[in-house]
Amino acid sequence: MAEKTYVMTLAEKKQLEAELEEYKLVRRPEVVERIKIARSYGDLSENSEYEAAKDEQAFVEGQIQILETKIRYAEIVDSDAVANDEVAIGKTVVVQEVGTSDKDTYHIVGAAGADIFSGKISNESPIAQALIGKKVGDKVAIESPAGSYSVEILSVEKTS
C-alpha cells in the first residue's frame, strides 16, 4: 500500500524538522527524567506522578512518530515554479467577496502547516481547492459548509 504524501513547502518541512528535534532532544529526555524521579517514590501501583509521566511519554513518542512520518513522506512544492500571479501552495492570496467590500487574506500551505488562527489554510481545504491554479482577476465560486459564495482574486504573492 502506498503511503500518503504530505504536500508542503521547504519552509514547512524545516519547521517540522525543528519540532522533531525539540521532541527528541528536549521533551523526550525531560519525560524520561520525570519517570525516573516518579519511580523513586516507591510503589508504582498507586503512583500518580509515574502514571502522568508515562502518559506524557506515550504522547511524546506518538508526536515523534507523526513528525517522522510527515517528514519522510514530504512532497516539497516549489512555489517559484508557478506563475507569479497564480495561486499555489506557498503563496498568499487576497480575495474580496463579490458584491461586498469584505476582503480576506489566506496563506496557502500544506496540511501539516495549516493554522486557521494565523490565516494559514491547508491546500486540502475547500477554499484553497477552489483558489489553487487561479490567477489575479479571476472570480471563483467557493463551496463551504456555510454555503456557496463568490470571490475575486485581488492579489497573489509568494509567502515569505
Curated annotation (Swiss-Prot):
GO molecular function: DNA binding; RNA polymerase binding
Signal peptide: none
GO-annotated biological processes: DNA-templated transcription elongation; regulation of DNA-templated transcription elongation
Keyword terms of this UniProt record: Coiled coil, DNA-binding, Transcription, Transcription regulation
Coiled coil spans: 1-72
Classification via InterPro entries: GreA/GreB_C_sf, TF_GreA/GreB_CS, Tscrpt_elong_fac_GreA, Tscrpt_elong_fac_GreA/B, Tscrpt_elong_fac_GreA/B_C, Tscrpt_elong_fac_GreA/B_fam, Tscrpt_elong_fac_GreA/B_N, Tscrpt_elong_fac_GreA/B_N_sf
Role noted for this protein: Necessary for efficient RNA polymerase transcription elongation past template-encoded arresting sites. The arresting sites in DNA have the property of trapping a certain fraction of elongating RNA polymerases that pass through, resulting in locked ternary complexes. Cleavage of the nascent transcript by cleavage factors such as GreA or GreB allows the resumption of elongation from the new 3'terminus. GreA releases sequences of 2 to 3 nucleotides.
Name the record gives this protein: Transcription elongation factor GreA
